[in-house]
């Protein structure tokens, strides 16, 4: 069984499985040439959508996170996307810990290398 997590995806499938990742205690999304904080990505979507984003958007990552989380209670679809990205990033981080430790499902051996296909 090939790893599903990688820090350097080489295919569309690999990029999809590793779209959201953690770095320096924050979550990033692979968008453009470099990774972008998921908070900044979602605030960019807010501006493009014409959301009533505060004129002075918070400058700290913590405040941006709180602002996006508060929008969930208003039914904001971008806040829902932010919540999904956050959840996906946490699940990927946990899976990466298992893979880094060499833990695989019973009856399987974990192989390093190109990501294999997965049957769901």
Task: State each model region's role.
Residues 1-82, 102, 109-120:
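Extreme N-terminal leader/activation tails
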Residues 85-109:
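Long, leucine- and charge-enriched amphipathic alpha-helices
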């Amino acid at each position: 069984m090939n790893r599903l997590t990688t820090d350097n995806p080489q295919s569309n499938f690999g990029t999809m499985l590793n779209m959201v990742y953690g770095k320096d205690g924050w979550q990033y999304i692979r968008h453009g040439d470099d990774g972008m904080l998921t908070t900044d990505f979602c605030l960019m979507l807010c501006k493009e959508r014409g959301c009533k984003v505060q004129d002075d958007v918070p400058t700290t990552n913590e405040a941006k996170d709180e602002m996006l989380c508060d929008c969930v209670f208003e039914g904001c679809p971008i806040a829902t996307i932010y919540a999904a990205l956050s959840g996906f990033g946490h699940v990927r981080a946990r899976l990466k810990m298992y893979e880094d430790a060499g833990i695989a499902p019973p009856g399987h051996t974990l192989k390093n290398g190109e990501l294999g296909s997965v049957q769901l």
